[in-house]
Swiss-Prot record:
Residues 1-39, 100-109, 181-197 are cytoplasmic. Belongs to the jagunal family. Residues 61-78, 131-159 are lumenal. The gene is jagn. This is Protein jagunal. It comes from Drosophila pseudoobscura pseudoobscura. One of its GO terms (cellular component) is endoplasmic reticulum membrane. Its main location: endoplasmic reticulum. It is a multi-pass membrane protein. The chain crosses the membrane at residues 40-60, 79-99, 110-130, 160-180.
Length: 197
């Protein structure tokens, strides 16, 4: 240990620690993508609560619980994809577990689960409401919404609400897959380097 003002090792000015105290690039990339993946999972949870608010009416009906304020909203009955998408939040535990332990196989399973339980239901929603949204987007200004075949809820086209949800959902799940893929790539490279050594 050197003391301040004490003898200095010949050939160095004391700044050589800058070259020795670097974190490997793969660890930095892994840490950055883990952090971003956790943010994506957080936004997935926020979207889940939006979906849960929509599903509350149907869930309470199935449990035979009557709440006047919720019934007055006249929320449309949910489709199957809404429940499948809501269940996709459970896959987040798999992703968090994989990120915590740097487990390549579990992260790959998480990516497949997000694709099947989150992105495919959103694609179905996108296709299901396409005709309503297209008709709304291309209709004349002089035509009233009530005169069309567009499904209306609270004075607005119902499909437009779902398109907004899908837009945010595609972004969240797209970034989730991107960060998970980056983690898998880095972890595989790191294990390949260990095997090579």
């Amino acid at each position: 240990m050197a003391t301040r003002g004490g003898p200095m090792v010949a050939g160095t000015d004391g700044n050589d620690f800058e070259f020795r105290q670097r974190v490997a690039g793969t660890y930095q990339i892994s840490l950055l993508n883990k952090s971003r993946l956790k943010y994506c999972i957080f936004f997935h949870a926020l979207l889940f609560f939006v979906m849960l608010a929509k599903l509350t009416s149907d869930i309470l009906d199935r449990l035979d619980i009557f709440v006047l304020e919720i019934e007055e909203l006249e929320v449309p009955s949910p489709l199957w994809w809404e429940y499948v998408w809501a269940g996709s939040l459970l896959t987040s535990f798999l992703g968090l577990s994989a990120a915590r332990g740097n487990k390549v196989r579990e992260m790959q399973k998480y990516m497949i689960a997000i694709l099947v339980f989150a992105i495919l239901p959103l694609l179905y929603c996108f296709a299901y409401y396409f005709s309503d949204v297209w008709e709304f987007a291309t209709m004349d200004k002089s035509v009233e919404l009530d005169e069309t075949d567009i499904f209306i809820w609270r004075g607005y086209p119902y499909g437009v609400f779902w398109y907004a949800f899908c837009f945010v959902g595609f972004q969240v799940h797209g970034f989730t897959l991107y960060f998970a893929y980056n983690l898998v790539k880095v972890w595989k490279a790191r294990t390949a380097t260990r095997k090579f050594q």
